[in-house]
From Swiss-Prot:
One of its GO terms (biological process) is cortical microtubule organization. ROP effector binding specifically activated ROPs and linking them to the microtubule cytoskeleton. Involved in ROP-regulated polar growth. Involved in local disassembly of cortical microtubules when associated with ARAC10 and KIN13A and conversely also mediates the elimination of ARAC10 from the plasma membrane by the cortical microtubules. Accumulates at the plus end of shrinking microtubules. Targets KIN13A to microtubules. It comes from the Eukaryota. Keywords: Cell membrane, Coiled coil, Cytoplasm, Cytoskeleton, Membrane. Component of the active ARAC10-IRC5-KIN13A complex. Homooligomer. Interacts (via C-terminus) with ARAC4, ARAC10, ARAC11 and (via N-terminus) with KIN13A (via C-terminus), but no interactions with SEC3A. The lineage of its organism: Eukaryota, Viridiplantae, Streptophyta, Embryophyta, Tracheophyta. GO terms for cellular component: cytoplasm; microtubule; nucleus; plasma membrane. Residues 99-115 have a biased composition (Basic and acidic residues). It is found in: Cell membrane; Cytoplasm, Cytoskeleton. This is Interactor of constitutive active ROPs 5. Residues 1-49, 99-122 are annotated as: Disordered. The keyword Cell membrane applies. Residues 67-124, 158-366 form a coiled coil.
Length: 396
């Protein structure tokens, strides 16, 4: 009767084997459990081999096996619930890690888009700077050409003024020589008149009335010639004064033109210097932006492009500095050549020389007036004829 009871017990073994597959679940969930809590390793290592050992031990009776199983069922259930909780925690952590991963990916995409926008804005900024530098170069070139043309016109005007001054100086010398010659003629005629008057006084006692009449006529002619020569001398002096005033006015206008050109060149030089400083500041800002972009972005192609743009702007800056230096040196040369102080000193020297000549002529006239030599009537008539011829030539 006991044997049939043992069979149902043997038949119950497959029914009570349902808790045994739990260790298989534990083996499948071993990685997640290992990541979440190290206690699962101890549970799986300590409990599962015992169950397997109890299962494999065929020598133990079925009643003991059933008792052991009924005693281990709560433990297995507790371990299963613990493992389920750990699995739930692992799933939650996995979900959190996936959410963090998605957030990190979204942030990376946003950063990538922002970097692309920054690159596009930097490219547009560099293109705008390049266009501005090209336009500035064109304006500078046109302004330099205009200044060169104006400088050429000013130099031609200055050279023409200098030529006019030279012509006036030569005319001044001619008029002074004519003035000295006319003064000499006047003095000689006055001397001749005095001689004739003395001869007339001496010839009162003579009986020749014809000679007296001739001498009177000669005296009248000499007086007329003296008045004509005096008027010619006065006209020469007035012409000399007018030409001197005109030459001084022209020199003053040339000096004012030179000062105006000099001030205009200095003003333009200051403007170009300010423009160059502004361009240098822009280049420094571009260099700083380039360094920041190099730190943020490691793309070598954009870096080379920016460096080439920077070198082009720097080369254009050097060209403008060279043009400014050339313009400055040309301006200094023109100002040195157009120095009117030398011309004023020359005119003063000529004036002083004319005064010296005039004083020398006056002293010579005084010496001639003090001379008491007499000439014959024939020589006086010849001298009068010569002075008449000279006077006619002067009138012609």
């Amino acid at each position: 009767m006991q044997t049939p009871k043992s069979r149902p017990g043997s038949l119950e073994l497959p029914q009570k084997k349902s808790p045994l597959p739990a260790p298989k679940v534990v083996r499948r969930l071993k990685p997640s459990g290992a990541e979440s809590d190290p206690k699962t390793k101890t549970i799986s290592k300590t409990q599962i081999p015992k169950v397997v050992a109890d299962r494999r031990s065929a020598r133990i009776p079925l009643n003991e096996i059933q008792k052991k199983r009924t005693g281990r069922i709560p433990e297995l259930e507790s371990t299963i619930s613990q493992l389920q909780e750990e699995l739930k925690k692992a799933k939650e952590e996995l979900n959190r890690s996936e959410a963090l991963k998605r957030e990190a990916q979204e942030e990376a995409e946003d950063a990538k888009h922002q970097l692309m926008d920054i690159n596009a804005s930097e490219d547009s900024r560099i293109e705008e700077l390049r266009k501005l530098s090209q336009e500035r170069d064109k304006t500078w070139q046109s302004e330099l050409e205009a200044m060169q043309r104006q400088h050429g016109m000013d130099s031609t005007a200055l050279s023409s003024a200098i030529n006019e001054v030279q012509k006036l100086k030569s005319k001044l010398f001619e008029s002074e020589s004519e003035l000295e010659q006319s003064k000499y003629e006047v003095r000689s005629l006055e001397k001749l008149v005095r001689q004739l008057e003395e001869e007339r006084v001496n010839s009162r006692d003579s009986s020749s009335s014809m000679e007296v009449e001739e001498l009177k006529e000669a005296m009248n002619l000499s007086r007329q010639e003296i008045t004509q020569l005096k008027s010619a001398v006065e006209a020469a002096e007035t012409r000399y004064q007018e030409e001197y005033i005109q030459s001084t006015l022209q020199i003053r206008s040339a000096y004012e033109q030179t000062e105006a050109v000099k001030s205009r060149y200095s003003q333009r030089e200051a403007e170009l210097t300010e423009e160059l400083n502004r361009t240098k500041d822009e280049i420094e800002g571009l260099r700083k932006e380039l360094m920041e972009k190099v730190k943020e972005d490691e793309s070598t192609g954009d870096l080379k492009k920016l460096e080439s743009d920077l070198m082009e702007v720097r080369g254009s800056l050097m060209d403008k500095e060279m043009e400014l230096q050339i313009l400055r040196s040309a301006m200094e040369k023109k100002v040195e050549t157009a120095n009117t102080e030398a011309m004023e000193a020359e005119l003063k020297r000529v004036k002083i020389q004319c005064e010296q000549w005039r004083k020398a002529a006056e002293t010579a006239a005084s010496i001639l007036n003090n001379d008491e030599e007499r000439t014959d009537s024939i020589e006086t008539s010849k001298m009068l004829k010569k002075f008449g011829v000279l006077l006619k030539k002067n009138h012609k």
